[in-house]
């Protein structure tokens, strides 16, 4: 027996994946950017068939879950290694305007900080307590109560109490000064002040006072008071204005209202006339600054007929409507009404009128035997005068007619025998020839 052929070497995984991707790309060419549900479903089915073959959906889901499980295991291993060997901590970055002392040093937390007191970040582990998760050994209700107790719910007494508790001891240690810290005032005005607020100007080491002076009123409280003072109801405004009028006033009735309205209208018309006269005087004086185009033509109507290069030659004349209606030009042309009696049919006199015969369409015209030469001469106008034949031509025609009538006609030209012979020839005639 001949030796068996060796089995082909298994292809590399990468080459197989490339082949599969090539097949998927060919089958789904032009469908990747389609958003339709059918196209997406088809693409998903093709990729599943090419990559996994005829596998069951459960097998595919199990394979995916194994992959995710492996990834999670790798992450856990990395986190354990980091905890054991304490890798290099990334440099801390603080946003602008934040005090570095209010942020816990990441190197100190890992036990790697070598700067000591020179470190710009805080080495107080209690700072992390404000942002860390709940601990089983710490009662979180104390902090929760303080977090809920914000400045929005405080009055002036509560605010003074919080300030004294928070900054009372530190204020006693500081040098005597009456200047209030601007950061402290900004925090109070913008509702940022609270139990966990830290002064950006140095915290407890700030040289300025963190306490409100006696009789201090916040800006927002001032604005609220001004708004309340300015807000007056319409009824109160009417009553105050009525009280200021006094007793010697005219009561409003229909008659007084109509008289007032008439007076106001007359004043308005008089004012309009005064304005028009003033504008007219200004226009005549050459001050046409506040005069409109319509008023210009009202003051000087002759400007309508003025022409320039782009205007037409039409001239417009001013006309009074009533005068034009009274002096209309009367039309002198006579007009006759339509009389129906004119359209009654009447018998017409046939004297001097040629009437065509009734059988002119059925009757045949007499045969003419004109010679072509005569026709040519007629066409050229030789023997025809004013549509009538000359006497010579009529004589010639008469002679020709006599000659044609004198020709003898053989009536027995085609006898019965000749016709029979003609029929036989037609029957025996070969059409193919």
Swiss-Prot record:
Lineage top rank: taxon: Eukaryota
A biological process term (GO) from this entry: cytoplasmic translation
Region (Disordered): 1-20, 358-420
GO CC entries: cytosol; nucleus
Ranges for region Required for interaction with DRG1: 238-262
Major localization class: cytoplasm
ZnF locations on chain (C3H1-type): 99-126, 175-213
Family: Belongs to the ZC3H15/TMA46 family.
Listed name of the protein: Zinc finger CCCH domain-containing protein 15
Source organism per UniProt: Danio rerio (Zebrafish)
